[in-house]
Regions:
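Conserved functional hotspot residues or short segments at active or partner-binding sites
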Residues: 175-183
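Short Gly/Pro-enriched loop/turn and capping motifs at secondary-structure junctions
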Residues: 124, 172-174
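Residue-level detector of beta-strand face positions
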Residues: 156, 171-172
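Cleft-lining beta-strand/loop regions that shape enzyme active-site pockets
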Residues: 1-160
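Short, solvent-exposed loop/turn motifs
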Residues: 2-3, 164, 179
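Short acidic, Pro/Gly- and aromatic-enriched capping/linker segments at domain boundaries
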Residues: 161-170
């Protein structure tokens, strides 16, 4: 092709859904797969839970395999649904960043439903926070392989030229006190 080709590109919002599967495996057993932890994950997750409860869900398989993580707040909100009041979900701590605890508020709607969490070597960050909170609070059973080990809290810092750099300021720790970050 000779010459210049001009194109008009129209930007559109593309909805990104983080719950990419939710169904009954057999009577009484629901299955939900979370692909990542985004801004609407909790809302999507609870919609899926309510539909499965209406179909008679008594147990839940939560699939976090290949889930690379996402927003801390989304992970905390999901974990809260399974835990009792004041149960530790995760805490962060760094050399120059004081410890910050994230605890369950006791208003979770899945506190009495047995849960089985599927994880693998690509389950990272927020997925490790949820699975770690469920495991350390004896709230469910983890099934699978050792997770990725991404437990860094990173903050963006703007540089004078307008660019940004993300620096590690703290680490994530599951309730047992174990750091998620792989050495």
């Amino acid at each position: 092709v000779k010459g210049v080709l001009n194109f008009m590109v129209t930007r559109a919002k593309i909805p990104v859904h983080t719950v990419n599967a939710a169904y009954m495996i057999r009577p009484g057993i629901g299955f939900i797969r979370l692909e990542s932890f985004g801004m609407k994950t909790h809302e999507e997750f609870m919609e899926a839970v309510e539909k499965l409860k209406q179909q008679g869900m008594k147990r839940l398989i939560l699939d976090l395999q290949d889930n690379g993580g996402g927003f801390l707040e989304a992970a905390v909100r999901i974990a809260n649904e399974f835990l009792q009041d004041n149960d530790m979900i995760v805490y962060t701590e760094g050399r120059r960043v004081s410890r910050q605890n994230y605890k369950a508020r006791g208003n979770g709607r899945l506190k009495d439903i047995p849960v089985y969490v599927l994880v693998n070597e690509l389950s990272a960050s927020a997925a490790e926070i949820v699975s770690g909170a469920i495991m350390d609070n004896d709230r469910g059973t983890l099934i699978g392989r050792r997770t990725f080990g991404k437990g860094l809290v990173q903050r963006p810092f703007e540089l004078p030229d307008g660019s940004m750099i993300r620096l590690t300021v703290a680490h994530y720790y599951i309730p047992s006190g174990r750091c998620i970050q792989k050495p």
